[in-house]
């Protein structure tokens, strides 16, 4: 579990997150929503210590986040950023990087490392890309490889910043299904998404940010009922009940 208590953060002395308090629970998918530049990605990077925190505290399973070394942190939290470099290596070699927190130096991969990589690539629908060079892959294929690398870290918390970027509709839905399955395994899954309807459909909890401030945090139904989505996005959001639950759309 990751708990943020009255967290503030700043870039170059300019405060960008203001008094945020929310919790990412194990066994749940939490989606961060908000307009561009509202602080969603910054929130994830603040949890990881990449952005200076100027106030408040962040707890990982009840312990201050600053008590964790980078190596120990990488065994607890996996992070899929918006973009990554594209080295000239195979997809499987890239996914093996997810095992670095468990290796000494020089790095010698064990059977369990190779097994974790194989399982992660299968989960991310990237197994058929194993021997392909990353520069030769499409953006969507590379995204699946990067997702597999995050899964290969075998962490209990997974932070993903726009994981559906570059993916076609089928693979977007597969990523959301994977997020649900990971939560079902007891992991805390946190996603930054721009697809409002997909987020409301798949999330257990939704956090809405605007100008670095938390506007709402709760179930999709509670957030919808609050009217905050209309105010923040300046749209009209509708919902209809189907056999599979609520479906949302907007105009």
Regions found by a protein language model. Name each.
Residues 158-162:
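Catalytic Walker B motif of ABC-type/P-loop ATPase nucleotide-binding domains
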Residues 2, 17-19:
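Conserved structural motif at the start of ABC-family nucleotide-binding domains
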Residues 230-251:
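ABC ATPase nucleotide-binding domains
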Residues 56-64, 73:
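Conserved ABC transporter NBD signature motif
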Residues 108, 133-137, 141:
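Conserved ABC ATPase signature
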Residues 96, 111-129:
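Conserved ABC ATPase "signature" region
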Residues 48:
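Helix-to-loop junction immediately C-terminal to a conserved catalytic motif
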């Amino acid at each position: 579990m990751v708990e943020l208590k009255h967290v503030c953060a700043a870039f170059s002395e300019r405060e960008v997150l203001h008094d945020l308090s929310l919790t990412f629970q194990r066994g749940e998918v939490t989606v961060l929503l908000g307009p561009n530049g509202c602080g969603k990605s910054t929130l994830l990077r603040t949890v990881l210590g990449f952005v200076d925190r100027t106030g408040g505290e962040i707890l990982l399973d009840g312990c201050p986040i600053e008590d964790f070394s980078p190596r120990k942190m990488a065994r607890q939290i996996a992070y899929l950023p918006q973009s990554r470099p594209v080295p000239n290596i195979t997809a499987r070699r890239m996914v093996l990087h997810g095992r670095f927190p468990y290796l000494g130096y020089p790095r010698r991969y064990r059977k369990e490392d190779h097994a974790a990589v194989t399982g992660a690539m299968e989960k991310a629908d990237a197994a058929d890309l194993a021997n392909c060079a990353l520069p030769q892959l499409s953006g969507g294929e590379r995204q699946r490889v990067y997702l597999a690398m995050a899964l290969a870290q075998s962490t209990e918390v997974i932070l993903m910043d726009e994981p559906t970027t570059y993916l076609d509709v089928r693979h977007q839905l597969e990523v959301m299904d994977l997020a649900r399955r990971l939560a079902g395994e007891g992991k805390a899954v946190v996603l930054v998404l721009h697809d409002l309807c997909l987020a409301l459909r798949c999330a257990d909890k939704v956090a809405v940010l605007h100008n670095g401030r938390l506007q709402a945090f709760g179930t999709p139904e509670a957030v919808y009922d609050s009217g905050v989505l209309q105010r923040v996005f300046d749209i009209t959001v509708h919902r209809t009940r189907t056999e599979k639950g609520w479906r949302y759309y907007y105009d």
